[in-house]
């Protein structure tokens, strides 16, 4: 069954925001990108449904731009913590259904959570944990933390186990490991 197309507003088109916006558009979603920097906006015009110059700290400007009509909004404003906080608050006031906000540190994370962001992400810390896991064990090809102590790990099968039936291996009984296809 094909996935329903959703609409996303990405506020802040720096490295992180533009990457998210481009990927969401590549997946077939309707994406508006917004930033104060005209150069960042103009680079996104050919790739997104819409790209606009917008001050996300201005609630009226966000309403006029129709940001309230998007299913999900991502506040990807990087260095300006005040602007990030105001943008998150404005999205909540506008009634945007789902709000993700990028934080620069733990305190910023707490503030965005208290303002009602549905998900607050710390990209550098999350990528740092991901990289450490993969560097720690060279057999790990990819790693996704699911939270609450659960992870999905793609590993290289050791040569000595190649060709063995999974049922013949004593995997999981003492380490709480589950094999996925």
What are these model-derived regions, one by one?
Residues 17-18:
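N-terminal Rossmann-fold NAD(P) dinucleotide-binding loop
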Residues 24:
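Aromatic pocket-lining residues of Rossmann-like dinucleotide-binding sites
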Residues 30-32, 99:
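Short beta-strand element of Class I
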Residues 42-131, 135-137, 156:
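Phosphate-bearing ligand-interacting subdomains
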